[in-house]
Amino acid sequence: MSQAQDYECRSHHVDEQEPRIPGSSTRLEWVEIIEPRTRERMYANLVTGECVWDPPAGVRIKRTSEDQWWELFDPNTSRFYYYSAASQRTVWHRPQNCDIIPLAKLQTLKQNTESPRASADNSPGRGSRDGSTGSSLEPELEERTQELPVRSGRATTLVTSKEDTSSCSPPGVLLEKDYEVYRDYSADGQLLHYRTSSLRWNSGNKERMLIKVADREPSFLTPQGNGYPADNQPGGHHRRPSGSQHSPNLQTFVPDTDGTVFFPERRPSPFLRRAELSGNCSPLLIQPRKPSSDSQPSSPRYGYEPPLYEEPPVEYQAPIYDEPPMDVQFEANSPYQTGSPQRSPGRKPHPFLQTTKQTPTSPCQQLMRTKQKCPERFLSLEYSPVGKEYVRQLVYVEQAGSSPKLRAGPRHKYAPNPGGGTYSLQPSPCLLRDQRLGVRSGDYSTMEGPESRPSQPPTPLPQAQEDAMSWSSQQDTMSSTGYSPGTRKRKNRKPSLCQVPSTSSTDGAGGLLGEQPLTEERSPCRASLTPVKAEADLVRGTPEPFLAQARLAWEAQQAHFHMKQRGSWDSQQDGSGYESDGAVPLPMPGPVVRAFSEDEALAQQDSKHWKRSTFDKLGFPQILLEKSVSVQTNLASPEPHLHPSQSEDLGACAQFESSRQNRSAMPSSSCVFPTFTLRKPSSETDIENWASKHFNKHTQGLFRRKVSIANMLAWSSESIKKPMIVTSDRHVKKEACEIFKLIQMYMGDRRAKADPLHVALEIATKGWSAQGLRDELYIQLCRQTTENFRLESLARGWELMAICLAFFPPTPKFHSYLEGYIYRHMDPVNDTKVTQHIKELLERNSKKKSKLRKKPKPYVEEPDGVAISTYAKYCYHKLQKAALTGAKKGLKKPNVEEIRHAKNAVFSPSMFGSALQEVMSMQKERYPDRQLPWVQTRLSEEVLALNGDQTEGIFRVPGDIDEVNALKLQVDQWKVPTGLEDPHVPASLLKLWYRELEEPLIPHEFYEQCIAHYESPEAAVAVVHALPRINRMVLCYLIRFLQVFVQPANVAITKMDVSNLAMVMAPNCLRCQSDDPRVIFENTRKEMSFLRVLIQHLDTSFMEGVL
């Protein structure tokens, strides 16, 4: 070696102790290695990391032998393992009486001596990355120019960056983002030296460096000075930031003494063998690197760097994605990104001595890089943060040959959610469109490699199967050389659908692609496979049947997963969720069928079950899950006078409705109980799955046999000894058994001393007071109304469910299941089927008893039928309404009058929450001559009778919630008590009636006109006259009523001028349908202005005396 080279070697190696071959006293820096597949000899320097094809001159070389073992390091288990190139064996324990070649250290050194792609990417004739393809010979001829030897012996320093410089930067451009770049230029403009400051994950004394795992570049491609090491270049100084240390990853590549530059990623091909000596260096290699802010992908013409070890010939599987070491801490504000560089489709990988290089990833593979069951720990897909103690040992080598068939897909970065614990998939500024594949940025497909079974340490894979591995997903950062022994210490997993017939089922490799669950946005990726495969067959010569089989198996796996998890992914794009899209609900196959077991209507929305069943395995970013979970509890919206036990379900249900509206095609109002879309229950999921995870294990009989889930979900005349749902609350455990007895009493299945209304009152009071009992109560009601062959008991069970829903909803966890159960009974056709079937069973039982000569029981007249559909429709409406309002507000517990009213409301609808036309129909018998709703006029008169126009803060100060509830109960019975004293009570109830109208007082189709003409009195009045007659009459009566309060004499006392009245009354007349807070905020001001204009300018004299 030259003196400069020798100085470079000795001043930049990582370890202070130079390596020695075990069993020898002579220091040997060069070793001979025979590549296992091509049987070609290679020579590596264990000190500098230099690799050459030809034997170096003037040095001793350790020849290869049968007893030569290569020492490698597995980062997953932090253990060394040993590979024999002669026998292709891999063992854990260090072999005895043999030569150990510490290639782990060599690999670490090579990782520290590589730099991003230099300006040679600008070579003429190079096809651009935006879709152009060339022949298989073109890249080889171009690379002949690229690998011309550099006789001047120029050295190259490593640039370690946090940003993927090759996948997003144009040729000759170093993307300056998230790191600092230091450059030295010579007088003629050539780049003499550049490097970056070390990046740290943690502050403090313990420095953790970033080893670039996913994108290694040939270090010799970076132009440097003329024959000098980086630190000793004349005319350029090695600049460093103050306080930074020369970290081990800033190493220098030294070419061979004869000037021949070895391409470590090159494999001999039919077109190119070795680089010939040349007296001149290619001008492409010395172009100065120009800073630029533009971002475009780098050239794909360089051959990629192959794995050191791959899977055994018997089988193979997609990689397992491993997380960084357990002791590495990450800062919360660090961006994590995935790169997607490319490589030449015309080059076969060199089979040996590579450092990891980011492989092309299609959109089908972007979301694959998440760690299973560790969403909080899947981080960088491009870098592996490791401490100094790992840098000197770890070997990061790619799992298998990267696919030259798939172009680089769009780049994405996984950014931590400020909420904590979740990660969001965000488009990178470097997003590009792959024109050749026609893949749009944002079209993703999710794939998952199967977990391997325990097996031996890794062994090489033949080239034929390496090509076939190109369809598999690529390995994450912390994966070692192929499949290291640590990656096999995973639990067993079901064999993949796409397992190739030639693979063995005894070892650790899985299918060709492994299990690849897909999201709903997968069609663009699937469509792009055909052209990709055709191109691959053209340039690589991969057998067509093998790729066709792989593609078919992959699509079969997609279809299998889609069918299996169809109900678990609430897709917004293709509508494959459970929205009915106008479909008529399917009738039940019969009442005997366990309806509750089939009623999974919205089971996939249960967040815990959904995450646990599918995407926990994938480690999906939580932000992706949040859109598909309809019931969440992260918002709370308690209201004044709210009972302490009601705040949680209020916010959760409000969030549920908000999420449900986001999925609907026509978003309903956020402050109204809209006409809810009926939904089909999912046939793929079953509540028994949920029950098996949440139910207690019940036993029966002397031998304590376990009760099946199906029997636990069917009607029972026996009592229960423990709650249906697993709970740790002692109060719930005690009350659950008592509630079940009370339910049996109310339904007539158990003798009761108290009146049924008082039994229902006790049940409703317990559920209203203790939120933990609500799910238990509803699951018991569902059980007792399933396979119940007594018509009276069945009717009472549904009646009790309606009573309970009038006071409190279930918790969000059980909301979807109850909704699905109710939905299944909303078809009126089933009422006749249930009644007929029950009568047939009764007749059959009576015949059996007559044959056995048993004394028949006294005949009890059964009702002709049960209107289950009527109960179900009412319960469905109350359930959706409770999702917005939550449980009954106030401090007073339910009373008998409220129970009676809730019982009668099933067949006698309330005036609150109904449409104007329905309210007029209700009062037609009592008040046939009235043109206005009785409730509106009666409450308005009551406000004035109590001197509301002389009461300060009228319509602004709320009335006592308990008194408002009591008055509402009376009004629903067409009564108004005479003992009222506070005008705020009827005023609050009047506002409640306006607010709870099924359709707003000013219909939605007129909303935009109102917002547009909020400043024009003429246009505003014209909008009022265009309303339907009943709406116009009610609105004009309201305006005339409010005009009383804006009189100057009244305003002086009430402190409620026209602006204040418009502010408090506008939300009761106009309802914004947008969910955008900015739109709501802006429209609120316009709504108030519109109502103020009406109060000031609308002529309501024609309403004099109208009732």
UniProtKB/Swiss-Prot annotation:
Q: What are the boundaries of the region Disordered? A: 1-21, 111-173, 218-267, 282-311, 326-370, 404-429, 441-529, 563-585
Compartments annotated for it: namely: Nucleus
Residues that bear Phosphoserine: 282, 380, 384, 402-403, 597, 683, 708, 719
Q: Where is the WW domain?
A: 25-58, 63-97
Annotated Basic and acidic residues bias:
7-19
A single Gene Ontology biological process assigned to it is: signal transduction
Q: Is Repeat a UniProt keyword of this protein?
A: yes
| One Gene Ontology cellular component annotation held by this UniProt entry | nucleus
The disulfide bonds in this chain are none
Residue ranges annotated for the MyTH4 domain, each copy included: 715-867
**Can you tell which superkingdom this protein's organism belongs to?**
Eukaryota
Site Arginine finger — annotated at 956
Instruction: Please list the residue ranges annotated as the Rho-GAP domain.
Output: 914-1102
Q: Which InterPro entries match?
A: MyTH4_dom, MyTH4_dom_sf, Rho_GTPase_activation_prot, RhoGAP_dom, WW_dom, WW_dom_sf
Q: Which PROSITE patterns match?
A: MYTH4, RHOGAP, WW_DOMAIN_2
Q: Keywords in alphabetical order, please.
A: Acetylation, GTPase activation, Nucleus, Phosphoprotein, Repeat
Offer one Pfam family short name for this entry. Answer: RhoGAP
Segments of skewed composition (Low complexity): 123-136
Mainly localized where?
Answer: nucleus
At what positions is N-acetylserine found? 2
- Give start-end positions of Polar residues composition bias: 111-122, 242-254, 331-343, 353-369, 470-484
Q: Which PANTHER family match?
A: FI04035P, RHO GTPASE-ACTIVATING PROTEIN 39
Any idea what this protein is called? Rho GTPase-activating protein 39
Provenance organism? Mus musculus (Mouse)
